[in-house]
Amino acid sequence: QDSLVGSEMCIRDRNITDGENILENVPVMITPGQAQNTVGMAVGYGRTRAGKAGDNVGFNAYPFLNTKELTITKIEGEYEFASIQLHHTMMGRDIVKETSLAEYIKDPSAGNHRELYHTYKGKLPANEVSLYEEHDLETGHFWNLSIDLTSCIGCGECVISCQAENNIPVVGKEEMRKSRDMHWMRIDRYFSSDMTKELSKEEKISAITMYSEMEVPSENPEVVFQPVMCMHCNHAPCENVCPVAATTHSNEGLNQMTYNRCIGTRYCANNCPYKVRRFNWFQYSENEKFDFHMNDDLGKMVLNPDVVVRSRGVIEKCSMCIQKIQELKLTAKREGRPIRDKDAQTVCASSCSTNALVFGDFNNKESEVSRLRNDERAYDLLDHLNVRPSVFYQTKIRNKA
């Protein structure tokens, strides 16, 4: 939000001037795919009358819009960016499964390889092997969320709507640098790498060298965006380790938080393979340091009264917008009708401009989410862990023709 995006392989401060206007100490973030000898700078920042939340954030790029001659000077110094994601390639893992359009036309399951594991019953996929006593999810509702990686463009609408709907505090760059992010959902971005496992075998490269080169994005990479939130696992690792039963499983397949039970051990966050649980390090709604319209009587009117404001020392996470589900149930009951497909919507799904996110009741066999779950493109993130998430993904299809 307050930097140049550059192509040169370094991160240093810069001075920018067109002879009349000058910006000093502008940090540069190196981004793969940026054309050589070019920089990009976001507009809309550097405001002086936006209020406490927006004043003096970033740099004002508008004075340079009509200039023909621009000088960028490298200066000494470094800048610590507030970036959540520290890894930028998948390093050969199938976190994002993808295929080409040509391959998908030939085989709808292309790119969606499912590993089989040795058991006493023979080779089986992970979701058919279990030591757990199964939940009864065939009766009533079973809420699922589908995410189409082909449609997702990484715009962040879902993150912003989730933030507003669920009273999630904005903690600022200083806290983000300490990995104290509070977003209930994040959008992971991965660049492609020139090094692959197949290429390493051909060139007989050692594993250490292969993975080191896999960390480096291609000069002109392909990019994929992947929204990640609480997966509402049916074999949830977080539920097993909570000593006070603050996180439990509902009979509708949702992983629930009881905030007034939570004592902040953070065992659940440690045990979550998706790293989607957030800890309240401060009483954000009362602390003046985080005064973004939450600390005065007028500002608190912006908070959603249907969602409790969490306290210091409490873990929080995606609730699958349970307040909207409960509101829908009451509405359907008053009207004397069953719940229809698409009646229930999480705010991330309803705000998505590309319809990449689809929410619904899997037990309604006519629902769109039920159809998508049974599609050959559907897969679970980290399916080898067999946590059986209620959030699933659709294989990304690239048109490389």
Where are these regions (language model features)?
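Short gly/pro/ser/thr-enriched loop/turn and capping motifs at secondary-structure boundaries
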Residues: 23-24, 35-36, 48-49, 286-288
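Phosphate-backbone binding interfaces of nucleic-acid-interacting proteins
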Residues: 40, 47-56
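Non-ligating segments of multi-cofactor redox enzymes
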Residues: 54, 61-401
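Short beta-strand-centered aromatic/proline hotspots
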Residues: 25-30
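Short, solvent-exposed secondary-structure boundary/capping segments
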Residues: 33-45
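Single conserved hydrophobic/aromatic residue that forms the stacking wall/gate
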Residues: 1-6, 11
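Helix N-cap / beta->alpha transition motif
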Residues: 7, 41-42, 100, 148
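Short conserved beta-strand and strand-loop elements enriched in small hydrophobics
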Residues: 12-22
